[in-house]
Amino acid sequence: MTTPESLGNFVAFMDSTDIGQLFVPSSKREMRQLVPDYSQDEDGVDRVKVLMATPNLIVFEAFRPSGETDRMHMHKDHHSVAYQKEGRVRMTIGSETFEVAPGDTYHHPMGVKHRHKSLEDSVRIEVKYYPEGNAIESWNRLAAGSNQSK
């Protein structure tokens, strides 16, 4: 079993008492602004709430206001799968573009460029899979530009 000690004592955007737990009550957690370290054209367009963190996975809920977009980018250390919970977005993955509606799911593999434009206020649940087992360290680096508290 994963223990809080094996994961460290800090996960960006996650309450420290939830680290390594089998059940995390999302309803008592607040969303926080994310300013990714790959951000150049964006101003922290997502508000995120980490729902679960393990050595290989980060699961979070993200809200993006209508009209906001990130620049085309890729991740060298993880794959992502997202479930569109609310709102519509235009998702470009590699050379393909999709209009994603509530209930749709999409995947952007590790190393594949992608961009996400919100056509309406939108909420997605995203799972990031880190095959090397460095999920928490990588997530904390990604969120390094954000104003967050431990």
Residue ranges and their predicted role:
Residues R88-R90, T97, K113, V123:
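Structural motif
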Residues K85, P102, E120:
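A cytosolic small-molecule/anion-sensing beta-strand core signal
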Residues M110-I136:
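Ligand-binding loop in jelly-roll beta-barrel domains
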Residues P55, T92-E96, L119:
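Short strand-coil-strand connectors
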Residues D77-V89:
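Glycine- and acidic-residue-biased ligand/ion/polar-headgroup-sensing regions
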Residues G44, I58-K76:
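Conserved short histidine dyad/triad with adjacent acidic residue
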Residues M1-N56, R71, R141-K150:
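A short, N-terminal "cap"/entry segment at the start of jelly-roll beta-barrel domains
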Residues G94-G111:
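Short acidic-glycine-tyrosine-enriched beta hairpin
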